[in-house]
Curated annotation (Swiss-Prot):
Coiled coil: none annotated. InterPro entries: Hexapep (IPR001451), Hexapep_transf_CS (IPR018357), LpxD (IPR007691), Trimer_LpxA-like_sf (IPR011004), UDP_GlcNAc_AcTrfase_non-rep (IPR020573). Keywords: Acyltransferase, Lipid A biosynthesis, Lipid biosynthesis, Lipid metabolism, Repeat, Transferase. This is UDP-3-O-acylglucosamine N-acyltransferase.
C-alpha cells in the first residue's frame, strides 16, 4: 500500500510537473479500471470517452491530464495531474504488481545442464529445462520449466524465459528481454531451392538470431535464423503473440508488431514503426522509420518516406487508400446507372432499326 502523497512523490521522479489535489494521507491499496474502482483504489483517465465515469467511479485517486478541470469532483476523489496520465498509470502499476513466481530460486534438480556452460549470479533454471553446451546465461536471469537452449546460446542479464521457450543453437539475446511461452527463436528459415524435376532441396540455414536489449516476444511467436549472417531484432522491439519473422529480417529499434503479422525473408522494418494485426510484408523490401501500418494491410513494396501511415492491400499511403475506398463504395451506384444507360441505348437503337431498314 502507498499513501497518495507517496504516489505523488514516486511519480514526480519520472514526470514533471505533477500536481496533487486532495488528501495526500489517504491509503491506496490497488489499481483498478475507472468503471469498477472502489474506495482505496487508484485509476486514470487518458481518453475523453471515459470522462463520464468521473461522476460515477468510487476511486479514491484519479490520475488525469493537467488541462482537465476537476473542481466539481474535488472532495469525492483526489487527483494527480500529469502531462501523460496513461504512462503515469503504467509506472504506478509497476509498483503494485506482485512479483511473478516463474521458477524456483536456483537450478532445479531435473534441469539438464551441458558442459562448458557459464551461469551468472542469482540465476533460476526451472524443472526439466535443458541447457546445451557452451551456453552463457547472465545474472538474475530466469529460465522456466521445459525451456530449451541448444548449444552456444548466449543470454544476457535480467532475462525471463517463460515455460516451453526454445532457443536454437547460436541465438544471442540481450539484457532485460522477456520471451513468452511457446516462442521459438532460431528455427530454420524457409529456404528451398527448386530443381528442374519440380522437387526442392533444402538450403542450409547457417546464420543466427540476434535480439537486443529490452525486447518482449509474445507467446507462440517465431523468429527464424538467417541463411547467412543474422536475423536481427533491435533493442526495444515488442512482438505480440503469433508473429512470424522470417530469415535475414531486421526489425528496427522500438518497433511494435501486433498479433498474426508476418514479415517475409530479408525484409527490413525501420525504427519506431507500428504494425497492426494480420499485416503481411513481402520479402526483400524496406520500410522506413516511424511508419504505421493498419491491420490486415499487405505491404508489397518498399516505402522509404519516414512517418507515413499505410493501409489496404496492396498497401498504399493512408490518404490515397481512403480515397480509393470511398470511390469503391460508389461502384454499386455506378453499375446501376450504367445498366440504365445500356437499356436506354438499346431502346434508342431499337427505335432506329425500321428507319435504317428502309434506306
Amino acid at each position: 500500500m502507498m499513501t497518495i502523497q507517496e504516489i505523488y512523490e514516486y511519480l514526480s521522479r519520472f514526470f514533471t510537473p505533477v500536481e496533487l489535489i486532495g488528501n495526500g494521507e489517504e491509503l491506496i491499496h490497488a489499481p483498478a479500471k475507472i468503471e469498477s474502482a472502489q474506495a482505496g483504489e487508484v485509476t486514470f483517465v487518458a481518453n475523453k470517452k471515459y470522462l463520464r465515469f468521473l461522476a460515477l467511479t468510487e476511486a479514491s485517486l484519479v490520475i488525469v491530464e493537467r488541462s482537465l478541470a476537476v473542481e466539481e469532483y474535488v472532495g469525492k476523489h483526489s487527483f494527480l495531474k500529469v502531462n501523460d496520465p496513461y504512462s503515469a498509470f503504467v509506472f504506478l502499476l509497476q509498483r503494485f504488481i506482485p512479483p511473478r513466481r516463474i521458477a524456483k530460486q536456483g537450478i532445479a534438480a531435473t534441469a539438464s545442464i551441458g558442459s562448458n556452460v557459464t551461469i551468472g549470479e542469482n540465476v533460476s533454471i526451472g524443472e526439466y529445462a535443458v541447457i546445451g553446451e557452451h551456453c552463457s546465461i547472465g545474472n538474475n536471469t530466469v529460465i522456466a520449466a521445459h525451456s530449451v537452449l541448444l548449444d552456444h546460446v548466449t543470454i544476457g542479464s535480467d532475462v525471463v524465459l517463460f515455460p516451453h521457450v526454445t532457443c536454437y543453437d547460436g541465438t544471442r539475446i540481450g539484457n532485460r528481454v522477456v520471451i513468452h511461452s511457446g516462442a521459438v527463436i532460431g528455427a530454420d528459415g524457409f529456404g528451398f531451392a527448386p530443381q528442374q524435376d519440380g522437387s526442392y532441396i533444402k538450403i542450409p540455414q547457417i546464420g543466427i538470431v540476434e535480439i537486443g536489449d529490452d525486447v518482449e516476444i509474445g507467446a507462440n511467436t517465431t523468429i527464424d535464423r538467417a541463411t547467412l549472417g543474422s536475423t536481427v531484432i533491435e533493442s526495444g522491439v515488442k512482438l505480440d503473440n503469433l508473429v512470424q519473422v522470417a530469415h535475414n529480417c531486421r526489425i528496427g529499434a522500438h518497433t511494435v508488431i501486433a498479433a498474426q503479422a508476418g514479415v517475409s525473408g530479408s525484409t527490413t522494418l525501420g525504427n519506431h514503426c507500428i504494425v497492426g494485426g494480420q499485416v503481411g510484408f513481402a520479402g526483400h523490401i524496406e520500410v522506413s522509420d516511424h511508419i504505421q501500418v493498419a491491420a490486415k494491410a499487405g505491404v508489397s513494396k518498399s516505402f522509404m518516406q519516414s512517418g507515413i501511415a499505410l493501409r489496404g492491400y496492396p498497401a498504399q499511403p493512408m490518404r490515397e487508400q481512403l480515397k480509393y475506398e470511398a470511390q469503391l463504395r460508389t461502384v454499386g451506384d455506378l453499375h446501376a446507372k450504367l445498366k440504365a444507360l445500356e437499356q436506354e441505348l438499346k431502346a434508342l437503337r431499337g427505335s432506329e432499326m425500321p428507319l435504317q431498314n428502309t434506306l
